Amino acid sequence: MTLGQQAEAHAQRYLEQQGLTFVERNVRYPFGEIDLIMRHKSHWVFVEVKYRSATQYGGALQALSAAQITRIRKAANHYLQLNRLDVPCRFDVIAMEADQIHWLVDAF
């Protein structure tokens, strides 16, 4: 299991402990990828997981670019259309740095 996969598994467990329900992991399309799809009450939550073992080159949050946000939004819209879902959704970020985890709800 790669570091990225370990971070995603840890993020999934963390979100489940916070009351979210796991739906899918690593949903990929040619134009974008979604790390985790969760449900929180009536909302579908598309989660981007960022992990950095050290902050010397910028933290986990700094690793999220505007281009990545655009790709994640496109992938989420495509997922909703493919699954014929007309539901409220949001985009969260799990930023992991060394032994700390930060959950940004409705991050973008």
Swiss-Prot record:
Q: Which residues form the signal peptide?
A: none
HAMAP family with a match to the protein in the record: UPF0102
- Which family is this sequence assigned to? Belongs to the UPF0102 family.
User: Could you give a GO molecular-function term held by this entry?
Assistant: nucleic acid binding
One Pfam family hit: UPF0102
Which CDD domains does this one have?
A: PoNe_Nuclease
- For this entry, the protein name equals UPF0102 protein Sbal_4100
What top-level branch of life does the organism fall under? Bacteria
InterPro entries per UniProt = Restrct_endonuc-II-like, tRNA_endonuc-like_dom_sf, UPF0102_YraN-like
Per its UniProt record, what Gene3D superfamilies does this chain match?
3.40.1350.10
